[in-house]
């Protein structure tokens, strides 16, 4: 017998034969005992040699390795069918050089397919790992541009940020107004031409709310006027409001009993209030007319707050109106700066129950009684 010469090709062929025997046992094919005996004889040097496929398929639970291994086993089973068809190869434990070259080419194709799969997976991971948010993309691009400007000029050119921001459309990013205390949502929706959202918001508002919205700003009024349904509701609500105001006014005035003015009762119940009267400055020319009109207004205002048992007198100091009490014969000036309290009998300061020092009572010319036989009495008799 000739001893086989074990080389690298023979080790590869033996490895492929081993896989064939395993598949034969699993699938139920018969394998000759001579082939198994030839496969069991191996040199120590051949056992240490390993192919690239063996070094790559260390992980049995790896899905990728499992698919490649299955593919190689299928190829080996096809070779087994070919070898079993020839009687020479079934009896002898050797393979031809042509078959070994075909198997090596198959291994090279498997290695290339594995490399392509790994490279495609790495590209997919890189594509998915990149950020899809425009804000993050803007930040990365701005950092790159700032880094380039710093390398050129040794200083950061912050104008680059505005130029980069124009290309990313950050004005359309949702949440750009977060953190602000006041945000005009209706104006923002109008600028973005979202009329369907505005129509839905206005449809949820009541009639009174629409009237209030028109009074907020011109922009809100314009938004309501652009929506036909909201505009009709607003006009109808305004008309209803005006009509209801008129009807309520007519009901309260026309169909109720005559009401008495309670100003007199209010003045009786309230304590006397001394109102400040501003004295107008005196000017040359129309000073007398101004004084007369202002004095008249003072007396009119003082008369409105009088009680039933009071009357008006002229103050002996400033000629302003004074409240007169007929029971006590006392008068108090209504002018705050004066506020003179005097006795109406002696025109001096009020002295309570003490008798007046000056008992001579001064009467005006209109209040003097006619004396019999006087010239005035004679004139009055002639007139009769």
From Swiss-Prot:
Domain F-box residues, every copy: 187-234
Binding annotation for Zn(2+) 2: 343, 346, 351, 356
Compositional bias annotation for Basic and acidic residues: 55-67
UniProt key word Cytoplasm: yes
SUPFAM superfamilies: F-box domain, RING/U-box
Gene3D superfamilies: 1.20.1280.50, 2.20.25.20
UniProt subcellular location: Nucleus; Cytoplasm
Amino-acid positions noted as binding Zn(2+) 1 in the UniProt annotation, renumbered to this chain: 315, 318, 333, 338
Main location: nucleus
Physiological role: During embryonic development, regulates the integrity of the genome and therefore the cell cycle progression by preventing rereplication through an APC-Cdh1-dependent mechanism.
Protein name: F-box only protein 5
């Amino acid at each position: 017998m000739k001893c086989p010469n074990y080389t690298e090709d023979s080790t590869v062929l033996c490895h492929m034969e081993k896989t064939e025997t395993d598949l034969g046992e699993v699938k139920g094919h018969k394998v000759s005992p001579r082939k198994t005996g030839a496969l069991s004889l191996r040199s120590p040097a051949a056992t240490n040699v390993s192919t690239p496929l063996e070094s790559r398929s260390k992980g049995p639970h790896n899905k990728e390795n499992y698919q490649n291994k299955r593919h190689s086993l299928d190829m080996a089973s096809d070779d087994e069918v070919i070898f079993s068809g020839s009687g020479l190869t079934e009896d002898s434990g050797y393979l031809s050089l042509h078959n070994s070259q075909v198997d090596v080419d198959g291994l090279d194709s498997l290695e290339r397919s594995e490399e392509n799969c790994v490279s495609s997976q790495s590209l997919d991971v890189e594509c998915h790992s990149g950020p899809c948010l425009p804000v993050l993309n803007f930040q990365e691009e701005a950092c790159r541009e700032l880094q380039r400007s710093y390398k050129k000029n040794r200083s950061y050119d912050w104008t680059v940020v505005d130029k980069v921001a124009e290309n990313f459309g950050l004005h359309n990013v949702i949440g750009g107004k977060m953190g602000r205390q006041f945000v005009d949502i209706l104006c923002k929706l109008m600028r973005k031409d979202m009329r369907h959202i505005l129509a839905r918001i206005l449809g949820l508002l009541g009639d009174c709310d629409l009237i209030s919205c028109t009074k907020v700003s011109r922009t809100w009024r314009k938004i309501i006027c652009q929506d036909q349904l909201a505009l009709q509701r607003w006009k109808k609500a305004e008309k209803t409001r005006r009509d209801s105001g008129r009807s309520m006014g007519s009901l309260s005035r026309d169909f109720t009993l005559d009401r008495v003015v309670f100003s007199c009762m209010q003045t009786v119940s309230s304590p006397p209030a001394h109102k400040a009267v501003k004295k107008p400055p005196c000017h040359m020319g129309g000073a007398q007319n101004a004084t007369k009109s202002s004095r008249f207004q003072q007396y009119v205002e003082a008369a409105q707050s009088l009680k039933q048992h009071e009357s008006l007198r002229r103050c002996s100091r400033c000629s302003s109106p004074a409240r007169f009490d007929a029971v006590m014969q006392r008068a108090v000036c209504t002018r705050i700066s004066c506020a003179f309290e005097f006795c109406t009998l002696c025109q001096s300061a009020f002295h309570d129950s003490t008798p007046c020092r000056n008992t001579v009572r001064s009467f005006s010319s209109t209040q003097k009684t006619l004396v019999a036989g006087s010239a005035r009495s004679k004139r009055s008799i002639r007139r009769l």
